[in-house]
């Protein structure tokens, strides 16, 4: 793995980062046993989506804090578990888990959510929240576990975690312009570059404009905690 420090050091680093956050509500959410809202935004037709945060709980092998995306009916669409560690004297985010919905949630629900978010997949929405958290704190790099490196890769864990869809991490990180550093780890960009509207086909510009407005709303919602 990328980081050789023991688990105790990793935990200390994460809570040092949380202590550095100026807004107590955000710090409380990231350490709470129960989900607490950290961002909201309006999707298509004015529907409000919420990103909650909590301590990692049962996902503690994947990280220390978890982000959760829920729709206006409180359906869980995606979750992301991460920690903040130290590498070469700098604070870095490490994504240890990224899950879709429980199996009781149909793929049609995810398609509708993606359409409501103007083409942004639920996992991509959570990544935007993470990018904003990194940008507004002292994080200097973002790393992510690969398919090979995930703690639940073993068959017995996949069977025990069968309530969730398991999509390929490697494919998703590649879609974010990530770079594979080893069999176990990817490095992701600190921000996703946006195309200018001039680069986009005219028939798609209105949809992209709405997508950018949604991303701006997510940014403003996270920024309100800093």
What is the predicted role of each segment?
Residues 79, 85-178:
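Acyl-donor binding region in acyl/amide transferases
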Residues 175-226:
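Charge-rich, low-complexity intrinsically disordered segments
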């Amino acid at each position: 793995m990328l980081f050789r420090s023991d688990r105790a050091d990793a935990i200390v680093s994460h809570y040092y980062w949380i202590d550095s956050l100026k807004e107590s509500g955000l710090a409380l959410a990231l350490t709470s046993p129960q989900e607490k809202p950290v961002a909201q935004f309006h999707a298509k037709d004015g529907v409000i989506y919420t990103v909650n945060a909590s301590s990692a709980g049962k996902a503690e092998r994947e990280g220390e804090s978890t982000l959760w995306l829920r729709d206006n009916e409180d359906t869980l669409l995606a979750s992301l578990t991460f920690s903040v560690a130290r590498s070469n004297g700098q604070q870095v985010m490490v994504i240890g888990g990224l899950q879709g919905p429980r199996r009781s949630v149909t793929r049609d629900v995810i398609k509708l959510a993606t359409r409501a978010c103007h083409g942004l997949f639920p996992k991509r929405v959570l990544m935007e929240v993470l990018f904003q958290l990194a940008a507004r704190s002292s994080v200097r790099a973002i790393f992510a576990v690969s398919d090979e490196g995930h703690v639940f890769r073993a068959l017995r864990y996949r069977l025990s975690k069968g309530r969730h869809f398991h999509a390929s991490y490697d494919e998703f990180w590649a879609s974010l312009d990530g770079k594979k550093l080893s069999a176990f780890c990817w490095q992701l960009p600190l921000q996703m570059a946006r195309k200018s509207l001039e680069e986009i086909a005219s028939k798609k510009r209105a949809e992209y404009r709405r997508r950018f407005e949604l991303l701006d709303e997510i940014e403003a919602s996270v920024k309100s905690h800093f």
